[in-house]
Amino acid sequence: MNTKLTLLAMFFPLFCFAQKQKDEIIVLNAYEDSIPSTSIYLKDRNIIYQKVFTSSLKQEELNNKLNAMLGTLKSFRFNSGVYTTQNEFFGFLYGHKFNVSKDDINLFNSTGYLTFPLDAVVAIQVKDYRYRITISSMEFVRDTIEPDNSLLIDYFLKQKSGLAIKQSKPNIKFATILNHEFNTLFNVEKSLLTTDF
C-alpha cells in the first residue's frame, strides 16, 4: 500500500502537467520574445517598449530633469490618479505624432496607421545614474466619429497565438521606427533642455 502511494505521489505531477498544452504555458516576469536590435519586447503576451537609459546625474537631479523634459512634451500627460513615489511616476502619451519620413510611411502603407496619433501608458522608474522607461498599451487612434476606432500595436506585431512576435521585414522596420521614436523622445541626455533663458 505504501509503495502505491509513493508511486502515485511521484507520478501525480506528470499526470497533471501532461494535459497542459504548449500554448497554455505562460512565462511571468520574463521576456517571451523580442525584435533584435530594438527595445520592443513581448512580455506577458503584451508588446512593450522597455529601455534603461544611463545618465551622469544622481536620482534627485535626474527626477528633476525628467520632470522638466516631460513637461515640455506636447503629447505627454502625467497620471495624477496613480500614487507616485520618489523614484517612480506614471503618465500617458496622448495623440503622439510620429516623426517619420514618407519612405517609412510608404513601407508600412498596408494600413497607413503611422500617420495616426499614438496613445500609450508610460511608466518611469528612476535610480542613481539610470532610469527605465516602459511603454505599454500602445494603440493608434483615428480621428473619426466611430466610437471604437483604434488599433493596438499588438495586432501588427504579435502572432495569432500571442506567444511570439512576427519577424517579417515590415514588422522589423516598424519596430525599428517605434524604437527610434521612443529613444529620442525619452533620452534626457539628448533632450533640448537648456539652462539658458
Give a label for each model feature:
Residues Q19-F197:
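Ser/Thr-rich, low-complexity intrinsically disordered terminal regions
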Residues M1-D23:
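Bacterial Sec-dependent N-terminal signal peptides
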